Regions:
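Peripheral (often C-terminal) accessory segments that flank ATP-dependent C-N-forming ligase machineries
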Residues: 144-199
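Glycine-biased flexible loop/turn sites that connect beta-strands or occur in inter-domain linkers
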Residues: 51, 112-113
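A short beta-strand motif that forms the metal-chelation/ATP-contact edge
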Residues: 113-123
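A short glycine-rich, hydrophobically flanked beta-strand micro-motif that places a catalytic Asp/Glu
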Residues: 30-31, 99-111
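Short, hydrophobic secondary-structure boundary micro-motifs
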Residues: 27, 56, 154-156
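Soluble sensory domains of the PAS superfamily and closely related sensory modules
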Residues: 18-22
Length: 199
């Protein structure tokens, strides 16, 4: 899924192995952006039948999975207000007339102070329930737009909440301490969602 190559020689070795295994398509090569998991962001959007963005929800990824098959999957997300990167993505989606769900993986690059977009997933993300944690049910948006034909207002879903799929102990052990106080507050306030556990 993801290979980190420190130099061109290693890159060529990895590409040779991938193609030797029978992979027939092109590969994407991206600049490696330094920083731990807390430099990641996820932006979930819904664009209506007219290609207008109606919902944006920014998640600050605090921890990702680190198993070989889990790399790139979020484990803990803290909702945060959408910033200037969201405005650019909104303009992009509307310029191309995009319709439906979109999910962007973004990383803050401390080298130049800018956010870098890795990819757009033309679907809901695996961690999509963090949007519900912020108070917005995206299935409801879809029904109101496509089935009921309603005109939807534009919403920035930035209500604070914490989404996690790992045990509390793991979260606090592996997330940098800068975020612990906010995580504890949200847990105490009942503003935490854990989609793998039902009460």
């Amino acid at each position: 899924k993801v290979f980190t190559c420190p130099d061109r020689k290693n890159l060529e070795e990895v590409l040779d192995k991938v193609y030797a295994s029978g992979y027939p398509d092109t590969m994407i090569i991206q600049d490696f952006i330094p920083g731990d998991d807390s430099y990641m962001r996820v932006l979930t959007n819904y664009s209506d039948r007219n290609g207008k963005v109606k919902l944006m929800c920014m998640g600050h990824v605090l921890l990702e999975e680190h198993t070989p098959h889990g790399i790139g999957n979020h484990a803990v997300i803290l909702n945060e207000p959408c910033g200037p990167i969201a405005e650019k993505i909104k303009a992009f989606l509307e310029d191309i007339g995009y319709v439906g769900f979109s999910n962007f993986d973004i990383k803050y690059d401390q080298r130049d102070g800018k956010y870098k977009v890795f990819e757009i997933n033309c679907r809901q993300g695996r961690s999509n329930y963090y949007v519900t944690g912020a108070g917005y049910n995206i299935a409801k948006l879809l029904v109101e737009d496509r089935v009921e034909g309603k005109e939807l207002p534009f919403v920035l879903a930035d209500n604070p909440s914490l989404w996690r799929v790992v045990p509390r102990k793991v979260a606090f052990e592996y997330i940098v301490s800068d975020y612990h106080q906010e995580m504890k507050q949200l847990m105490q306030q009942g503003r935490e969602v854990r989609p793998l556990f039902y009460d």
